[in-house]
Each structure stands twice: as structure tokens, then as C-alpha cells.
A protein has these predicted regions:
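Metal-cofactor-binding active-site regions of metalloenzymes
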Residues: 4-26, 43-50
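Histidine/acidic residue-rich metal-binding segments in metalloenzymes
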Residues: 25-205
Length: 205
């Protein structure tokens, strides 16, 4: 990309990396980020058992290495172990409709992961960007961290501002499935909390 953009790009741009298939060599690659124009790296606390998942030890190492090179760490914050358990419980009970996507991804699993990510980033003094925040419990964790002066930012998405979990109850499976996303859609009180956080500058994207 940098080769193709050289002498052609008319705007400033940066590249965004994502960790998959954890191996020791990725930490050497992070050291090369500045030269390659990569200013941020995204990790997933969810999706345990998949190549996307990053455990806490690896997350901590990525935070340390990112701080050393001046990169911001983006995080998808959900407690993957609890999500796997809740999903397996739904499957055992035959609860397979889109409604149970929300049941298996409750707000506390996001809030706990947000709190943990903030704490680990604080221990390494690494800038943290919390992607697609959805619930008031997670917003409260962000507010506490920013109140201490920690370098942490939060974003949300349009669908979390405008759509609530009730759409997952549509009896038409195909229609309800259109609204399956992770983290899951929340309730009206969460929508309102997100709007307030945006209006007050707590959420910045």
C-alpha cells in the first residue's frame, strides 16, 4: 500500500493492523509499525477458540510493545470465556433464534472486559481505543478512567444509537437475523446513555 501511495496520495493516511494467529514474531512486527505507517493495532477479547482471540497475557505484551512504538491499541471488549459458556447453554436448551444472541451476550460481559482492558492499558500507560461501545455499564467504566486522566477513548456505532434489542424478537427469523451483531443490540436506556455520552464528549467517535 505504501508503495502504491508514494507520490500519489493527496491526503494523510495511516494503516490499521489486526492480530490473528498469535505467535512470537508478531511482537517483532509491531516494532516495524512506524516505518510502515501503521499507527494502531486491534485486538479481540472475545471469540475464544478462534484465531482472533487474544488472551490477557498476549494483550498485555501487545500493550507494552505498542507503547514502545507509539501505537494505539483498539479493543473489541467482551468477556470471551463467559460468552462461550452462555452460548453453549443456549444451544443445550435449543434456544437458537436471534433473540438468544442478546441473551448470550449480556451487557455485563462487555462492561467487565472494558474495565479489564482499561486497567491493563493503565498499567502499561498505553493509549487505548474501545471500539463499538453499547451499554451504560461500559460507559461508566470509560467515564471513571477518563476522570483519572488515562489516555482512553471510546466509540459507538449508528445501530447502537438507533436500534434496540426488540428487533431480535421478530418472528421472521431472516428479518431478525439481519440485526445480529457483536456486541449485541441493547435496550432503550442504553441508547439514551450513548447519546448522552456523545453529547458530553465522553464518546468521541
Amino acid at each position: 500500500i505504501n508503495v502504491r501511495a508514494k507520490d500519489k496520495a493527496c491526503v494523510d493516511f495511516a494503516l490499521h493492523a489486526m492480530v490473528t494467529y498469535i505467535m512470537d514474531s508478531i511482537f517483532d512486527e509491531i516494532e516495524d509499525f512506524p516505518r510502515r505507517g501503521i499507527s494502531s493495532i486491534k485486538i479481540f477479547m472475545a471469540y475464544n477458540g478462534s484465531p482472533l482471540h487474544v488472551d490477557d497475557g498476549t494483550f498485555f505484551r501487545i500493550l507494552e510493545k505498542s507503547r514502545q512504538v507509539g501505537a494505539t491499541v483498539f479493543v473489541h471488549a467482551e468477556n470471551g470465556e463467559i460468552l462461550n459458556f452462555l452460548r453453549s447453554e443456549c444451544v443445550k436448551k435449543g434456544q437458537l433464534t436471534p433473540h438468544y444472541h442478546y441473551v448470550s451476550r449480556p451487557p455485563f460481559t462487555e462492561a467487565e472486559a472494558v474495565r479489564r482492558a482499561i486497567y491493563l492499558a493503565g498499567q502499561t500507560d498505553t493509549p487505548l481505543y474501545i471500539a463499538h461501545m453499547t451499554c451504560r455499564e461500559a460507559i461508566a467504566e470509560l467515564q471513571k478512567a477518563k476522570g483519572t486522566g488515562q489516555r482512553v477513548s471510546g466509540e459507538t456505532c449508528t445501530h447502537y444509537l438507533t436500534t434496540t434489542k426488540e428487533v431480535l424478537d421478530n418472528p421472521d427469523f431472516n428479518e431478525a437475523a439481519k440485526f445480529v451483531c457483536s456486541p449485541a443490540l441493547r435496550d432503550q436506556e442504553d441508547c439514551e446513555a450513548l447519546w448522552q455520552a456523545l453529547a458530553g464528549g465522553l464518546l468521541t467517535a
